[in-house]
Amino acid sequence: KKYKTINITYKVVGSDKIKEFKPNDPLYLMEESTTAGYKNKAVMNLRTNDNHPNEGKIEFKVIDPITKKEKIENVTFRFSSIKSEIFVEERDQTSDFMTHLKRNTGISFVRAGREIDFGTFDFFDLSIATERFWGCEILFEPILDEVFGVSNNKQGVKNMNALNAYQKKE
């Protein structure tokens, strides 16, 4: 599967200059993004199969607020990891590339196709350099807002810490 980039240009107010806008891709799957030193190359590979029924998905039973009927909604987990040749190539911890990776290290929560939160959520230690070599997106629809503790302004999630023993049992 190839991930496409939408190229957007914009004009700065009070200027005749046209600038190009590139997306920031926390999974590093897009060829055209803001990744330092890799303008036209994806630096990571997708490690989950989006179309496989048993991989990367958790089903939640919820009550539809409109129909009041129970329905199943999916939460999709997508993971990427650095390509081996780039891992070997990029050893300088102070390079622009490594700085870019460090800024993007974390878990992205994506609600209805839009990233609403990003961070470590206490699942791993950001200071460990090897944590920079993978990415994670957790995708869900608005019907699951309560499950994720989505704030009223739709700008974040709450209580996304490691599960305790009781929660794991449930």
Residue ranges and their predicted role:
Residues 43-170:
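Charged regulatory segments coupled to nucleotide-binding catalytic modules in large multidomain enzymes
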Residues 1-14:
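ATP-binding catalytic core of ATPases
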Residues 35-41:
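Active-site loop ensemble at the mouth of alpha/beta enzyme cores that anchors a bound cofactor
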Residues 14-33:
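N-terminal non-catalytic structural scaffold regions of very large proteins
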